[in-house]
Amino acid sequence: MRKTFRIEHRTIISLLLALTLSATAAAQTPASATSQTASDPGLQRLEREIARLSTVSGGVVGVTAIHLETGRRVSMNGTERFPMASTFKVPIAVQLLTRIDKGEVKLDQMIDIKQSDLHPGSGTLADLFNKGGLALSVRNLMELMLLISDNSATDVMLRTAGGPEAVTARMRSLGIEGINVNRSTAQLIADWIGVTNLPPEDRWNPAVFSVAFNAVKPEDQKAAAKRFDADPRDTSTPDGMAALLERIYHKDLLKPESAELLLDIMRRCRTGEARLRGLLPQGTEIAHKTGTIGGTTNDVGIITLPDSAGHIVIAVFVKSSEKEVAARERAIAEIARAVHDFFLFQPRAAL
């Protein structure tokens, strides 16, 4: 029954969720208008359209989108914090690759996977193996983390990157204040469900997780989910995530070959077919990473426009939604298409 607790899966089934729905029309209005938007009627219209499309999600939506070649940007609730869910695997990858660039870790370095490394949620390692005894390279584990959002691989990579504190410190060193990484995926899921009695990490295994998760009463899980939505840990602002993606694209925070490796893996992402890429024209190139937990559904990435029209960094977060995942995904897809078409046909402000 481990799928009940998936943090990342297109067909996620929320575990007895009854999150408070706080989305209203007022919640979807932009938190503040930038001077750029105020002087650009086209961006103002796009901002209003994003707010309108957001209501489909049934939750609170945050969006930041930047046309990289011109710097034109639109933001709605851009400074509000949202649970990252598995989108936090992007900053983890950045810190991991930073260590690789410094020679502290090697891509071909083999890492033994122990039974205590098999964690709940999305991916394949915990599904295929219930004991340790295998070894995978850092490159393979990073690919599992980003391609299929494998939580076991993620927690091994988080440890290899130096832990949550090192990831957050790297974000601060880049001048990005909006991203906090504080817990492993296993700890994050346990907090969302309301588990308070997990043993020390070296005694973790799939059976331990299953027993602990199934022991939580529905009313306790509901209360834990509400606390989770208000918790500043493992959150990002749309502006913060967009800033990180912009730096990744410009390849000024990693060695060029490391930045390109990260982008290549993100282009091959196998999750979230109905999100950012869901309504984009067939063949549109997008490097992205999704995230899902409870009432949260996210997708962040870089869209390549056709006909040399440039690139768009976009971060879309949905939180506190009681609607089914499909409705949240539809909102993300419609917002992405609106942003795509706007910057394709109006790359510069009208005179």
Spans of model-derived segments:
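Structured C-terminal helix/loop/strand segments within mature extracytoplasmic catalytic/sensor domains
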Residues: 29-49, 53, 226, 230-351
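N-terminal secretory signal peptides that target proteins for export/translocation
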Residues: 1-9
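Bacterial N-terminal signal peptides
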Residues: 11-24
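Active-site-adjacent loops and short helices of periplasmic peptidoglycan-processing enzymes
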Residues: 31-193
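Active-site-proximal helix/loop microenvironment
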Residues: 83, 178-254
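N-terminal acidic, proline/glycine-rich, low-complexity intrinsically disordered segments
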Residues: 2-3, 24-30
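A short small-residue
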Residues: 72, 128-130, 223-226, 316-318
